[in-house]
Amino acid sequence: MSSSIPFYDKNAHTLCQQYNSVTFETVHKSWQAYWPLEGDKVLDIGAGSGRDALWMHKAGADVIAIEPSASLREQGSKYTGPSVTWIDDSLPSLSRTENLGMRFELILVSAVWMHLAPSHRERAFRKLSNLLAPNGKLVITLRHGEFQDSRQGYEVSVEELERLSKNSALLVRHVDDSQDRLNRNEVWWQTVVMTLPDDGSGDLNKVRHIIVNDNKSATYKLALLRTLLRIADAHSGAVIDRTDGKISLPVGLVALYWVRQFKRLIDIDIEGVGIQQNSNTSKGLGFVKDD
C-alpha cells in the first residue's frame, strides 16, 4: 500500500473530483441489503475523498475514516466536515485504529485490497475480523484490471477472501460482480460481504478470538477446543449436566471426535519423522505418551 501513497498524494485533487462524480448509491448498490443502519459504528478504510464516509454519516452512522495519504485525508476531511473522524492509519497494521478499543458494525474496505501485497493479506484480514462487533459486516471490493499509472496493484480473488474468512470464522454472505462505474473498460469489480456470527451471549466470539489469535504453542489445547466446538455444534443434547455454570460431556464422545479429527495427523510419517509440535525434531507430540 505504501508504494502507491505518493501517487495519491500528488493527484489528490483530481482523484477526489473523479471519485465524487459518482454517488455512494451507484457504486455500492450491489450490497444495499447490508448498508449501515442508524447508530451503527462504521470503519471506512481507504476513505479517499470522503464520499462514502459522508453518505454513511448522513444515514445516521458513527463513521471513522482511515486514510494513509495526507493529501487525500486533507481533501476528504474538508468534504465531510468534523462529523466524520479521520485517522492516519493503514493496512495491514491498523495500529492507531486498534488503539481506539472499538468494535464496528460495518467495516468497508473499498478499492484498497488490490494495493496490499499477498504476503500482507492474512495479517490484514485478521486485524479486520478482530475489529468487528458481533454480527458485524466486513465489505471488501476487489478491483480487477491493471493500473495505467504508477500505482502498484496485485491480483485479487473471491477465493482468497473465502479462505481467509474461513480461517477467521467469518461467513461469506454475498458476492457480486459489477462493471466499473467510472466507465474504464479495462476495469471490473467484485464485492464480497462477510459477517461475524454471534450466538447472543458473546461466548462464541470469545472462543473465536482464542482460536484465531492463539500462538499455537500448545497445540493440544487448541485441538481440544476445536473438538469441543464440533460437539457443541452437532450434539448439544449430549450434555449430561449443566449445573454451577459448567457442563459435563461423555468422555467417549470427546475421544471419538478427537480421534476422527486428529488421528490422521498423528499418523503422518515423512521420511521417518512424524508431525512436529516442537522445533526440536527429536521431540514428538507432547500429549503422545509411550503408555
Annotate each PLM feature:
Residues 214-223:
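Structural motif
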Residues 1-39, 43, 48-99, 116-123, ...:
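Class I (Rossmann-like) S-adenosyl-L-methionine-dependent methyltransferase catalytic domain
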Residues 130-133:
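Short, conserved loop/helix-junction motifs that constitute active-site signature segments
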Residues 111-112:
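Short catalytic micro-motifs in class I SAM-dependent methyltransferases
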Residues 108:
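A conserved beta-strand element that flanks and buttresses the S-adenosyl-L-methionine
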Residues 204-214:
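Domain-level detector for secreted/extracellular nuclease and nuclease-toxin modules, and
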